[in-house]
């Protein structure tokens, strides 16, 4: 059966978008608010109509992730910011594989996400309450699966409880995207052997987005 590289690229961009948000938060203490909203919402939408539906039904919602994916696929250096993004992306993939083989953790994750949906009736998606709840899910359900993702950035910035919560919530969104990536036929070997296919697909999607003004 032929791989659907459109869906695979969208899901992979979702992982990369989360990685980029983590990087922005860790270095600057803030991040692209629209991209964060899209990524956080992907965790809560349990019944999307399509791969694109997970990310709000618009390719433009993944612009940050698509641009990050191209940087990761074409990174010539193992140092610096692209190396950080590659490490976060690969680490999320490893954790997702551990999650997929831990039935108890999967069940707990589903229950906790249902709890988030109830909280959304009373709190905004980017409120401190929801952010802390998502961070708590990451700490309680995902982190124990190991290995832990080492987030690097500004020590002063990373001391902030609000930044820590947003980082963990973004990592949870990355796990969601990694689950989706496997569901649509993604696999780590593609990063080695299908780089050109993924790069071409990402460029094609970005080409029909309206330029940012």
Swiss-Prot record:
<keyword id="KW-0997">Cell inner membrane</keyword>
<keyword id="KW-0963">Cytoplasm</keyword>
<dbReference type="InterPro" id="IPR007451">
    <property type="entry name" value="HflD"/>
</dbReference>
<feature type="coiled-coil region">
    <location>
        <begin position="79"/>
        <end position="122"/>
    </location>
</feature>
<keyword id="KW-0175">Coiled coil</keyword>
<dbReference type="GO" id="GO:0005737">
    <property type="term" value="C:cytoplasm"/>
</dbReference>
<dbReference type="Pfam" id="PF04356">
    <property type="entry name" value="DUF489"/>
</dbReference>
<comment type="similarity">
    <text>Belongs to the HflD family.</text>
</comment>
<keyword id="KW-1003">Cell membrane</keyword>
<protein>
    <recommendedName>
        <fullName>High frequency lysogenization protein HflD homolog</fullName>
    </recommendedName>
</protein>
<keyword id="KW-0472">Membrane</keyword>
<dbReference type="GO" id="GO:0005886">
    <property type="term" value="C:plasma membrane"/>
</dbReference>
<dbReference type="InterPro" id="IPR035932">
    <property type="entry name" value="HflD-like_sf"/>
</dbReference>
